Amino acid sequence: MKKYEIAIIKGDGIGPEIVDEAKKVLDAISYSHGFELSYHDYLMGGIAVDRAGVPLPDETIEGCLRADAVLFGAIGGEKWDSLPRELRPESGLLKLRKSLEIFANLRPTVVYDELIEASTLKESVIKGVDILVVRELIGGIYFGEPKGREGDKAFNTMVYSVPEIERIAHVAFKAAMRRQKRVCSVDKANVLDVSQLWRETVTRIAKEYPEVELSHMYIDNAAMQLIRNPKQFDVILTGNLFGDILSDEASMLSGSIGLLPSASIGGKAALYEPIHGSAPDIAGQGIANPIATIASASMMLRHSLGEVEAADAIDKAIVKTLKEGYRTKDIAAFGAKEICTTDEMGSIIANYAAKKGE
């Protein structure tokens, strides 16, 4: 039987609750699909600051580098917001991405038919939406130098090199080849020099993928078009800052940020996480939606472990659970036949994934 080592980072807030449900689903499905998972827990975020004095202990980095993949919950909270930047939970995640040489973030947005009323947009606008945002993750303005403060002035620098743009472009075009073969590259080339280089480089790389249709869009127009006509998009390729914004905007097409997973890939180990935050205001209440984390576990099986059939089983179990009317509190107003706790939702999906609930 195949064996895989998974690094587990539960993090802060609802992180431990939702990661436990993802593990429950993975455990329910692994044996029947011929593989075994072993988990190793590590600290990151606010809990790491409290226990180890830093947001990312060296032990966590080393453990993640040894693992076949990393499954992560969420970090952060008001408790740590006043700390110096280098001690805030978010700095730990940025450092981990850099340590793992991760450079590409994949964020799918799929509108489930069963939850179409959850969106604030009309059914005619969002029905059938299936978008993948490919975001460059370790370059751009979040990491560019120089940055800092001088008296009453503060500054950051947006920097991209040709190799950085080339490698993220390849990720987007390869993803498009498995989808509808359309890439929309989003930049601000009418204002920013760095975006002009981005557009030139992406256009050149596109020639290596003649089957893929490439279009370009300015970030302000893209933000508007994502609401006006989201079905025009297949794969959206963009930089770190713009991708951070667009992926959160796209998430609301589905009606709940608690539904959507993400994968951060390209380096020594891949990191899988829900796109929502740590939601400390509902932590410990048993009402958090675990679907995004369970879907992230499915992406882990698919992209890092090659267990495609198991991933398909989880995805189908999520759809079946929603079709049967099971809902957590955040989506309870839309077709709910039964309101579930976090634990109950995880158990239902686990049962369907293992074919116990058929």
From Swiss-Prot:
SMART domains: Iso_dh (SM01329). Its cofactor is Mg(2+); Mn(2+). It is an enzyme of class 1 (oxidoreductase). Pathway: Amino-acid biosynthesis; L-leucine biosynthesis; L-leucine from 3-methyl-2-oxobutanoate: step 3/4. GO terms for cellular component: cytosol. It catalyses: (2R,3S)-3-isopropylmalate + NAD(+) = 4-methyl-2-oxopentanoate + CO2 + NADH. Catalyzes the oxidation of 3-carboxy-2-hydroxy-4-methylpentanoate (3-isopropylmalate) to 3-carboxy-4-methyl-2-oxopentanoate. The product decarboxylates to 4-methyl-2 oxopentanoate. One of its GO terms (molecular function) is 3-isopropylmalate dehydrogenase activity. Substrate binds at R97, R107, R135, D220. PROSITE patterns: IDH_IMDH (PS00470). Keywords: Amino-acid biosynthesis, Branched-chain amino acid biosynthesis, Cytoplasm, Leucine biosynthesis, Magnesium, Manganese, Metal-binding, NAD, Oxidoreductase. InterPro entries: IsoCit/isopropylmalate_DH_CS, IsoPropMal-DH-like_dom, Isopropylmalate_DH. The keyword Amino-acid biosynthesis applies. Its EC number is 1.1.1.85. Belongs to the isocitrate and isopropylmalate dehydrogenases family. LeuB type 1 subfamily. Mg(2+) binds at D220, D244, D248. This is 3-isopropylmalate dehydrogenase. NAD(+) binds at residues 77-90, 277-289. Binds 1 Mg(2+) or Mn(2+) ion per subunit. The record marks Y142, K188 as: Important for catalysis. Gene3D superfamilies: Isopropylmalate Dehydrogenase (3.40.718.10). GO terms for biological process: L-leucine biosynthetic process. NCBIfam families: leuB. Homodimer. It comes from the Bacteria.
